[in-house]
């Protein structure tokens, strides 16, 4: 798969704007500011194709990228407390609409900040994916921020316990800084879209 040929296609502010498509899709989900854009940029081998922000709640649209005939779908981040109720409602409608509309979703890449235990929202999202039968992996972002080996190992082991319903080989530590886990993420993506 030619990740370096990735192109931004379009952004949609409501579910009803989404065009129908039978192209295979890889969806990226996670809390606001968890590092979805950083992971996408690392995959695309670009600095800023996906906009990175230090402001939580920045991605409020569903963003589509074309990668070799596969849609990479950057879903809006959830769980940011300062977002107005109307925005939370719009987010819920977009997510529900996206996942319940018979799209050709091959894999969901669920991102969780490795420095902290998964939140209630993270667990709810993963349970939803499991109950609805979507294939998913969990990418533990910001692994490079855990400087001490002991802290890193403990956090990873605790995460595996906290997400015991996820197969351990599907929990992948990732760093946008040093590239840890990137090749493993690519292998899973390629496994589900056929290379």
Which residue ranges define each predicted feature?
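Canonical P-loop GTPase G-domain recognition
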Residues: 3-15, 145-195
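Conserved C-terminal guanine-recognition region of P-loop GTPase G domains, centered on the G4
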Residues: 96-169
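Conserved nucleotide-sensing/catalytic segment adjacent to the nucleotide-binding pocket
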Residues: 67-105
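Conserved nucleotide-binding/hydrolysis micro-motifs of P-loop NTPases
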Residues: 58, 70, 77-80, 115-117, ...
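Conserved G1/Walker A P-loop phosphate-binding module
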Residues: 1-80, 194
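Amphipathic alpha-helical transducer elements in NTP-driven molecular machines
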Residues: 88-92, 119-123, 153, 179-182
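Structured catalytic cores of enzymes that bind and process phosphorylated ligands/cofactors
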Residues: 26, 33-34, 40, 63, ...
């Amino acid at each position: 798969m030619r990740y370096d040929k990735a192109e931004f296609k379009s952004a949609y502010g409501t579910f009803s704007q989404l065009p129908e498509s039978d192209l295979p899709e890889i969806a990226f989900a996670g809390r606001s500011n968890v590092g979805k854009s950083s992971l996408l940029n690392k995959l695309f081998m670009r600095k800023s194709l996906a906009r990175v922000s230090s402001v939580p709640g920045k991605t409020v649209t569903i963003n589509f990228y074309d990668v070799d005939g596969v849609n990479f779908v950057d879903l809006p981040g959830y769980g940011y407390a300062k977002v107005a109720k109307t925005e939370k409602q719009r987010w819920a409608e977009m997510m529900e609409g996206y996942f319940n509309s018979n799209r050709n979703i091959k894999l969901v890449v669920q991102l969780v900040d490795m420095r902290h235990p998964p939140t209630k929202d993270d667990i709810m999202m993963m349970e939803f994916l499991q109950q609805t039968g979507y294939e998913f992996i969990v990418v533990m972002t910001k692994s490079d921020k855990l400087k001490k080996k002991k802290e890193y190992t403990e956090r990873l082991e605790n995460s595996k316990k906290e997400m015991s319903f996820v197969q351990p080989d599907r929990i992948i530590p990732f760093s946008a800084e040093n590239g840890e886990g990137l090749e493993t993420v690519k292998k899973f993506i390629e496994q589900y879209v056929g290379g």
